[in-house]
Swiss-Prot record:
Major place of residence: cytoplasm
Family, per entry: Belongs to the class I-like SAM-binding methyltransferase superfamily. RNA methyltransferase RlmE family. RlmM subfamily.
GO cellular component, one term: cytoplasm
Amino acids binding S-adenosyl-L-methionine: S183, A216, P217, G218, G219, D235, D255, D271
Reaction catalysed by this enzyme: cytidine(2498) in 23S rRNA + S-adenosyl-L-methionine = 2'-O-methylcytidine(2498) in 23S rRNA + S-adenosyl-L-homocysteine + H(+)
Cysteines engaged in disulfide bonds, as pairs: none
Protein name, as recorded: Ribosomal RNA large subunit methyltransferase M
Subunit note: Monomer.
Length: 353
């Protein structure tokens, strides 16, 4: 049980390997990362006993950028029949767990296994409960079974408060038919990712003011309007008429990189296709000058060296805000609905009393 399995978006396995390898080096956890292209997962194999557990103890999952989910454990080969008996034998070396998730990888093979997992979960859960291997206790580790095929599974453990909030790290969001574009789901997922659900009524409250830079046709604006915020939509392109009819949207035809609000707003959101360095400078201006209280901004990534680019951009943003004397929390994640991009959440911190 000394490997770390990390789920990711297909095509970003190299970024996961670079990111977890960098953290392991900093923490002096010996091992190596490996992955196959477009397999939707990577594995960090630790050379020392307890290495995977130490990595998960020392790192906060919320602080990782490219992994969607993680678990410590090992791959196990399964027979064509009597799979549950073999699993119970291996799980005898695992602690009693408080919850169970059956997961697949975000690949064509993974999608084909989804039906198998749904059917297999019922008898497996029953067997685990009968043998005392599974209790209903959120304080205990979660048992994560990631099936790479019907004959191979990763038996993993993760702490519920230090792993993904959803199986495979994929939120089950429904596309609202009224929204003018599917990009609307990126902003909704960002809120789920970065803002505790119990804080939504306070931090995403009706009547708040918001600016959407590069708004047309209004996918992100729709989310803001759906929370009954007053929105300034900045874009030279046309906005969906349904949003304009809401009475909550002012359409300003201007360059999103030039526009500045007359007074500070509660929220700024931005999903403009632009070089990430220019977008990072925009973040520094808006948060550094106090033009908004919170922001969700997408950074478009190059084709190569994407982990290194994200690290440089985050360092630049943090250094730039610090130089302006602004106290701002900065978080970054590649969301499920992101493509060749990552999403940043920034929040100005209250001045010390």
């Amino acid at each position: 049980m000394n490997s770390l399995l990390l789920h990711c978006r297909p095509g970003f396995e190299g970024e996961v390997c670079a990111e977890i390898g960098e953290h392991a080096g900093r923490l002096n956890v010996a091992g190596y990362a490996r992955a196959k292209p477009n397999s939707a997962h990577a594995e960090f194999v630790c050379s020392e006993p307890g290495g995977a557990e130490r990595l998960m103890r020392e790192l906060r999952f919320a602080g990782l950028v490219f992994p969607r989910q993680w678990a410590r454990g090992a791959f196990v080969e399964l027979p064509e029949s009597e799979r549950i008996g073999v699993l119970l034998e291996h799980l005898a070396a695992y602690p009693v767990c408080g919850s169970l998730w059956l997961e697949v990888l975000d690949s064509n093979e993974g999608k084909e296994l989804s039906t198998f997992c749904r059917k297999f979960e019922v008898p497996l859960r029953k067997a685990l409960g009968k043998t005392g291997r599974l209790l209903d206790d959120p304080r205990r580790p979660r048992l994560l079974l990631t099936f790479r095929s019907g004959r191979e599974v990763f038996l993993g453990l993760a702490e519920p408060d230090n792993s993904a909030a959803w199986p495979m790290g994929i939120p089950r969001l429904k596309f609202p038919r009224e929204a003018p574009s599917r990009s609307t789901l990126k902003l909704e997922e960002a809120w789920h990712q970065f803002i505790p659900r119990e804080a939504w009524d306070l931090r995403l409250a009706p009547g708040m003011s918001a600016v959407d830079l590069g708004a047309a046709p209004g996918g992100w604006t729709w989310q803001l309007v759906n929370r009954h915020m007053k929105v300034t939509a900045v874009d030279n392109g046309p906005m969906a008429q349904s949003l304009m009819d809401s009475g909550l949207v002012e359409h300003v035809r201007a360059d999103g990189f030039v526009f500045r609000p007359r007074r500070p707003v509660d929220w700024m959101v931005c999903d403009i296709v632009e070089k990430p360095a220019r977008t990072a400078a925009l973040i520094e201006t808006w948060l550094g000058e106090g033009l908004c209280r919170e922001a969700v901004v997408n950074l478009k990534l190059p084709m190569k060296q994407r982990h290194a680019e994200v690290r440089r951009l985050l360092e630049r943003i943090r250094d730039g805000l610090s130089a302006r004397g602004a106290k701002v929390s900065v978080a970054c994640r590649q969301l499920y609905h992101d493509r060749e991009e990552v999403t940043c959440h920034l929040c100005r911190l209250p001045a010390p009393a």
